[in-house]
């Protein structure tokens, strides 16, 4: 093979499939993509060595090629056919009944000699003129004790007809019977079964007419023609070993037996039970049993189609239609039993005889039984489970489900369609639909939570998150992480400003915190300087996720409550977050310097939520402070450190790979994606390969809260990390891995999982019931959100999706991101008819010009509740208008006039309100509504057209309802749009 070998070429050479060869290559550690890929020469050599069957196949093919070559060579190579035949006694015209005189001498030797000749037939080319040898014997009874003299006689008999006899005159039976093929050479009672061997015919089963006369035989083959055998049942396979052996070459047969040497014909009473049954082919009487003088077997049965029993037309006992010692060519349909040896199809179809159905295997029966038990949904057969649990990721498709249960995805699609759900095979499906489909098939579908799925993902890379490596001796103390929580405007950021001696509050829009910040400050306790890490969380209701995130990443929480305001909804929510995270709480009662402040009231209110002050016998420390005046700030810090030392084990291993959490992230114009990361364990260094959520990268730079570069960050240290390829999500776990390749693979798989889950969540389920409504035009508000950091975008999206609106209107966030508004966002908005909301960001470059040209609406906000209010108003504007009915007046019909052009004209008196032309009216008769919607088509006052007639005036009018009578009342009304609340 020139050049490199391809996989499919090697598979063809080795006699295996390409799939098997690919599996072998995979086991050997070779990466081959497909069957058309090439492999190197050493690999190909190893493959040839690993498949020994290839060599065996070659040897087998060589042997098989040699065998046919040797076989025809023997025929012309036997020079003695003509010499051998005259040497033996050859019967002339056969007498009518020579059988009774001859059988005495050869009968005893008949059973043993041919049976022993079968195994020795190929090795005995020299014929022996023994008259006992050609007698047919039972093909299935080997006799090991046969005399050796009988062995060379076996091939002698059938060899004669292949070359033909020299003397002239056609003879019907020029061939001697084959040794071992006469089923009647021994007593029939010795046969254990009617069919001695799979390919052998039943004795006497051939349907035949009368035997031809001695001189009426067909033309014998010309001398020297040793090729085709004029066997009646030719085309059947050679008999198996033990059934007479292979046919010897022509010209090596013994002398033709005389009539006196033939065994007596058995009487019908000695026949086997099944031999007397007519052949399945039908159409003629059963063939003669054979064994007549001259060695001619029974003839073929009558009937053209299917011509008799298996083996019809063959010699008596010839296995599977093999050439007999004599007789004419059999009728069509000859051959062995259908489905067995000798059952080759001929020009007239399959061999004759009734078709017998084979027995089903256990596997086939099992498959049929399981298909009967399989559930059918709408005519679709589905696999049946036994209550097995199938684990699927959130947002999995039907193809994923089908792979788990080894089913056809198309069947699952059709089954869901019959259940009323329209999905495709690759579409992300929500959890309820997967559970519904699994229940129909008796499977328990378990949707894996994102946490478990992420844990399994990390386990596949031999990574763990959340545990310190090493033992107790490797742990070192670390600073506590404190989160400041509370209601909006209760003074959380002002408290942090006092602690940090900075002013962050003035920089926040609207005076409320819309970001989550992390700082590390140095404080003093009992003469020792201690580091404390503070995390500031927003108090606005839209930032619930931020507060929950801050509670999870913290060791201790400071709950700020205004003394003049009391416990508020976000205060309760902050308490719940802290208690859910099992975080101890220190309560700071702020604004005690204001009038109306009542710290005792705060203590009483918080008692209802499980925060009992120490002075009330509890274990929660309360500190009264004033962030504005700076009162008791040191006492608050001391309480924080005391609580942390008393109830927390603040230790971590700084020598392991860093693990942490991304508190917030944003896109900086000059630095790219920037994430504020809190290190929880290990040490983060510049140059480490990191992955956080679906973002990955390498640490290029780290900056602390003061803008100073940091080369390594120890546990409990908040830093800004620069070097991500994309903006990570707020709250994503940060992990250091060995190399960038692993980080990229983890990020890509997380991104795919997130995308599938989002697709399953955002796509509305369309059932067959509401298909008509779904196809109609419906109102939908598409939004594109851009913000200054990921936490704000997340909070804004959750707040907008939580707006209570009617089902008639849908709110869909088609894109979200961190950073300025780009031209790509504008193009997407123009294509999807969306509105762009920029939160603390502006349009970049020519995005504004493109938006004006495309007619895209861009809204800028700096306070989150303003964005929520305006989007809510826009959604309510998309709702279908709600109308209310306003009564205009009533008119009583006093007279009726008939006009050939117009029809009925009603003369009315307006009893109340006014009547207007083209207004809607209700026809009332005897206090019953006759017509609900009637339009006043024309209105006249005297002979002049009028648009309105007031109370007390008469008028003439026509309506779009003909059945009006005197005394009817027309109640006129109009529909006015009702403003929504």
UniProtKB/Swiss-Prot annotation:
<dbReference type="Pfam" id="PF04760">
    <property type="entry name" value="IF2_N"/>
</dbReference>
<feature type="binding site">
    <location>
        <begin position="590"/>
        <end position="593"/>
    </location>
    <ligand>
        <name>GTP</name>
    </ligand>
</feature>
<dbReference type="GO" id="GO:0005829">
    <property type="term" value="C:cytosol"/>
</dbReference>
<feature type="compositionally biased region" description="Pro residues">
    <location>
        <begin position="256"/>
        <end position="269"/>
    </location>
</feature>
<feature type="region of interest" description="G1">
    <location>
        <begin position="486"/>
        <end position="493"/>
    </location>
</feature>
<comment type="function">
    <text>One of the essential components for the initiation of protein synthesis. Protects formylmethionyl-tRNA from spontaneous hydrolysis and promotes its binding to the 30S ribosomal subunits. Also involved in the hydrolysis of GTP during the formation of the 70S ribosomal complex.</text>
</comment>
<keyword id="KW-0547">Nucleotide-binding</keyword>
<feature type="compositionally biased region" description="Low complexity">
    <location>
        <begin position="146"/>
        <end position="165"/>
    </location>
</feature>
<feature type="region of interest" description="G5">
    <location>
        <begin position="626"/>
        <end position="628"/>
    </location>
</feature>
<feature type="binding site">
    <location>
        <begin position="536"/>
        <end position="540"/>
    </location>
    <ligand>
        <name>GTP</name>
    </ligand>
</feature>
<comment type="similarity">
    <text>Belongs to the TRAFAC class translation factor GTPase superfamily. Classic translation factor GTPase family. IF-2 subfamily.</text>
</comment>
<feature type="region of interest" description="G2">
    <location>
        <begin position="511"/>
        <end position="515"/>
    </location>
</feature>
<dbReference type="InterPro" id="IPR015760">
    <property type="entry name" value="TIF_IF2"/>
</dbReference>
<keyword id="KW-0648">Protein biosynthesis</keyword>
<dbReference type="InterPro" id="IPR027417">
    <property type="entry name" value="P-loop_NTPase"/>
</dbReference>
<feature type="compositionally biased region" description="Low complexity">
    <location>
        <begin position="112"/>
        <end position="121"/>
    </location>
</feature>
<dbReference type="Pfam" id="PF03144">
    <property type="entry name" value="GTP_EFTU_D2"/>
</dbReference>
<keyword id="KW-0342">GTP-binding</keyword>
<feature type="region of interest" description="Disordered">
    <location>
        <begin position="31"/>
        <end position="370"/>
    </location>
</feature>
<dbReference type="InterPro" id="IPR053905">
    <property type="entry name" value="EF-G-like_DII"/>
</dbReference>
<dbReference type="InterPro" id="IPR000795">
    <property type="entry name" value="T_Tr_GTP-bd_dom"/>
</dbReference>
<dbReference type="InterPro" id="IPR006847">
    <property type="entry name" value="IF2_N"/>
</dbReference>
<feature type="region of interest" description="G4">
    <location>
        <begin position="590"/>
        <end position="593"/>
    </location>
</feature>
<dbReference type="InterPro" id="IPR023115">
    <property type="entry name" value="TIF_IF2_dom3"/>
</dbReference>
<feature type="compositionally biased region" description="Low complexity">
    <location>
        <begin position="64"/>
        <end position="87"/>
    </location>
</feature>
<feature type="domain" description="tr-type G">
    <location>
        <begin position="477"/>
        <end position="649"/>
    </location>
</feature>
<dbReference type="InterPro" id="IPR044145">
    <property type="entry name" value="IF2_II"/>
</dbReference>
<feature type="compositionally biased region" description="Low complexity">
    <location>
        <begin position="270"/>
        <end position="279"/>
    </location>
</feature>
<feature type="compositionally biased region" description="Basic residues">
    <location>
        <begin position="356"/>
        <end position="365"/>
    </location>
</feature>
<dbReference type="Pfam" id="PF22042">
    <property type="entry name" value="EF-G_D2"/>
</dbReference>
<dbReference type="InterPro" id="IPR004161">
    <property type="entry name" value="EFTu-like_2"/>
</dbReference>
<dbReference type="Pfam" id="PF11987">
    <property type="entry name" value="IF-2"/>
</dbReference>
<dbReference type="Pfam" id="PF00009">
    <property type="entry name" value="GTP_EFTU"/>
</dbReference>
<dbReference type="GO" id="GO:0003743">
    <property type="term" value="F:translation initiation factor activity"/>
</dbReference>
<dbReference type="GO" id="GO:0005525">
    <property type="term" value="F:GTP binding"/>
</dbReference>
<keyword id="KW-0963">Cytoplasm</keyword>
<feature type="compositionally biased region" description="Pro residues">
    <location>
        <begin position="136"/>
        <end position="145"/>
    </location>
</feature>
<dbReference type="InterPro" id="IPR005225">
    <property type="entry name" value="Small_GTP-bd"/>
</dbReference>
<feature type="compositionally biased region" description="Pro residues">
    <location>
        <begin position="88"/>
        <end position="111"/>
    </location>
</feature>
<feature type="region of interest" description="G3">
    <location>
        <begin position="536"/>
        <end position="539"/>
    </location>
</feature>
<feature type="binding site">
    <location>
        <begin position="486"/>
        <end position="493"/>
    </location>
    <ligand>
        <name>GTP</name>
    </ligand>
</feature>
<keyword id="KW-0396">Initiation factor</keyword>
């Amino acid at each position: 093979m020139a050049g490199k070998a391809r996989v499919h070429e090697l598979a063809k050479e080795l006699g295996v499939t390409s799939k098997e060869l690919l599996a072998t290559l995979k086991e050997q550690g070779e990466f081959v993509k497909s069957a058309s890929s090439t492999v190197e020469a050493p690999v190909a050599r190893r493959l040839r060595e690993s498949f020994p069957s290839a060599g065996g196949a070659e040897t087998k093919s060589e042997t098989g090629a040699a065998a046919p070559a040797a076989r025809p060579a023997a025929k012309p190579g036997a020079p003695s056919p003509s010499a051998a035949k005259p040497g033996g006694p050859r019967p002339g015209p056969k007498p009518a009944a020579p059988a009774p005189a001859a059988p005495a001498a050869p009968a005893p030797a008949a059973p043993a000699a041919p049976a022993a000749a079968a195994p020795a037939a190929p090795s005995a080319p020299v014929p022996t003129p023994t008259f006992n040898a050609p007698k047919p014997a039972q093909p299935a009874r080997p006799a090991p004790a046969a005399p050796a003299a009988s062995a060379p006689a076996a091939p002698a008999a059938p060899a004669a007809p292949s070359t033909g006899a020299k003397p002239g005159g056609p003879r019907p039976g020029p061939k001697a019977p084959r040794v071992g093929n006469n089923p009647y050479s021994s007593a029939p009672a010795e046969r254990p079964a009617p069919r001695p061997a799979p390919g052998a015919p039943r004795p006497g089963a051939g349907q035949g007419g009368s035997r031809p006369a001695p001189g009426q035989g067909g033309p014998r083959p010309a001398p020297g023609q040793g090729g085709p055998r004029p066997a009646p049942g030719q085309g059947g396979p050679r008999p198996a070993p033990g059934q007479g052996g292979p046919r010897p070459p022509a010209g090596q047969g013994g002398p033709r037996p005389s009539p006196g040497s033939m065994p007596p014909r058995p009487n019908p009473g000695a026949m086997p039970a099944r031999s007397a049954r007519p052949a399945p082919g039908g159409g003629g009487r059963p063939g003669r049993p054979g064994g007549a003088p001259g060695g001619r077997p029974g003839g073929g049965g009558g009937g053209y189609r299917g011509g008799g029993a298996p083996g019809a037309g063959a010699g008596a006992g010839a296995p599977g239609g093999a050439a007999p010692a004599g007789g004419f060519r059999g009728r069509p349909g000859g051959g062995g039993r259908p489905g067995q040896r000798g059952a080759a199809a001929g020009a007239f179809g399959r061999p004759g005889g009734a078709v017998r159905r084979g027995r089903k295997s256990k596997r086939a029966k099992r498959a049929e039984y399981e298909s009967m038990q399989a559930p059918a949904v709408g005519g679709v057969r589905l696999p049946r489970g036994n209550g097995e649990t199938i684990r699927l990721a959130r947002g999995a498709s039907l193809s994923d489900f089908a792979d788990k249960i080894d089913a056809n995805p198309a069947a699952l699609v059709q089954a869901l369609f019959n259940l009323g759900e329209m999905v495709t095979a690759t579409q992300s499906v929500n959890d309820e639909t997967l559970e519904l489909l699994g229940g129909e098939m008796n499977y328990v579908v378990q949707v894996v939570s994102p946490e478990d799925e992420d844990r399994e993902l990390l386990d596949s890379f031999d990574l763990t998150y959340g545990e310190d490596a090493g033992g107790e001796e490797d742990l070192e103390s670390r600073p506590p992480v404190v989160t400041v929580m509370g209601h909006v405007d209760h003074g959380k950021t002002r408290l942090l400003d006092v602690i940090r001696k900075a002013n962050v509050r003035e920089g926040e829009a609207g005076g409320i915190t819309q970001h989550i910040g992390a700082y590390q400050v140095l404080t003093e306790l009992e003469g020792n300087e201690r580091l404390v890490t503070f995390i500031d969380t927003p108090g606005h209701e839209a930032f619930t996720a931020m507060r929950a995130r801050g509670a999870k990443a913290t060791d201790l929480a400071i709950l700020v409550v205004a003394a003049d305001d009391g416990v508020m909804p976000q205060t309760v929510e902050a308490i719940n977050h802290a208690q859910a995270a099992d975080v101890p709480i220190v309560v700071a009662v702020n604004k005690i310097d204001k009038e109306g402040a009542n710290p005792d009231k705060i203590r009483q209110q918080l008692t209802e939520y499980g925060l009992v002050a120490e002075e009330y016998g509890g274990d929660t420390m309360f500190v009264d402070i004033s962030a504005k005046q700076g009162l008791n700030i040191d006492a608050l810090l001391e309480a924080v450190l005391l609580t942390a030392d008393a109830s927390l084990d603040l230790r971590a291993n700084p020598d392991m790979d860093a693990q942490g959490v991304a508190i917030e992230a944003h896109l900086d114009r000059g630095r790219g994606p920037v994430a504020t990361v809190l290190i929880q364990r290990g040490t983060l260094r510049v140059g480490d390969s990191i992955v956080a959520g679906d973002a990955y990268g390498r640490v290029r730079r780290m900056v602390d809260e003061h803008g100073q570069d940091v080369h390594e960050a120890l546990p409990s240290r908040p830093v800004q990390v620069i070097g991500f390829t994309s903006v990570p999500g707020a709250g994503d776990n940060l992990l250091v891995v060995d190399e960038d390749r692993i980080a990229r693979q983890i990020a890509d798989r997380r991104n795919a999982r997130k995308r599938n889950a989002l697709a399953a969540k955002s796509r509305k389920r369309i059932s067959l019931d509401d298909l008509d409504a779904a196809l109609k035009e419906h109102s939908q508000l598409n939004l594109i959100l851009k913000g200054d950091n990921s936490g704000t975008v997340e909070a804004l999206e959750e707040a907008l999706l939580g707006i209570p609106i009617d089902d008639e209107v849908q709110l869909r966030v088609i894109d979200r991101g961190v950073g300025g508004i780009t031209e790509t966002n504008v193009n997407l908005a123009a294509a999807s008819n969306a509105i762009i909301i920029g939160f603390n960001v502006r349009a970049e470059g020519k995005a504004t010009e493109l938006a004006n040209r495309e007619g895209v609406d861009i809204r800028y906000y700096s306070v989150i509740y303003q964005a929520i209010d305006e989007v809510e108003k826009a959604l309510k504007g998309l709702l279908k208008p709600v109308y209310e009915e306003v009564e205009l007046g009533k008119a009583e019909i006093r007279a009726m006039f008939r006009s050939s052009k117009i029809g009925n004209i009603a003369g009315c008196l307006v009893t109340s309100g006014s009547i207007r032309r083209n207004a809607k009216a209700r026809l009332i008769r005897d206090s019953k509504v006759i017509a609900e919607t009637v339009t006043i088509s024309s209105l006249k006052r005297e002979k002049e057209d009028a648009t309105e007639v007031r109370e007390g005036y008469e008028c003439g009018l026509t309506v779009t309802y003909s059945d009006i009578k005197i005394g009817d009342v027309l109640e006129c009304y109009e529909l006015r749009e009702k403003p929504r609340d």
